[in-house]
Amino acid sequence: MSKRTFQPSNLKRKRSHGFRARMATANGRKVLARRRAKGRARLSA
């Protein structure tokens, strides 16, 4: 039997999907803009 592939880590989660990670790149800022336009309660992890 194979192991579960999702091994949660809040540090990795924030580093790859966090607000500051999104703000760091132009495309990340586009992601945030789209989510704001859609009216998301949470913009990032």
From Swiss-Prot:
Alphabetically ordered keywords of this record:
Ribonucleoprotein, Ribosomal protein
**Short name of one Pfam family:** Ribosomal_L34
Residue span of region Disordered: 1-45
**InterPro entries from the entry?**
Ribosomal_bL34, Ribosomal_bL34_CS
What's a GO biological-process term for it?
translation
GO CC term, one of those recorded: ribosome
Gene Ontology MF: a single term: structural constituent of ribosome
Judging by the UniProt lineage, the source's domain of life is: Bacteria
What segments bear the compositional bias annotation Polar residues?
A: 1-10
Kindly give the PROSITE patterns that the UniProt entry links to this protein: RIBOSOMAL_L34
Q: Where is the composition biased (Basic residues)?
A: 11-20, 31-45
Q: State the similarity comment.
A: Belongs to the bacterial ribosomal protein bL34 family.
NCBIfam families recorded? rpmH_bact
Q: What is this protein called?
A: Large ribosomal subunit protein bL34
Q: Which organism is it from?
A: Shewanella amazonensis (strain ATCC BAA-1098 / SB2B)
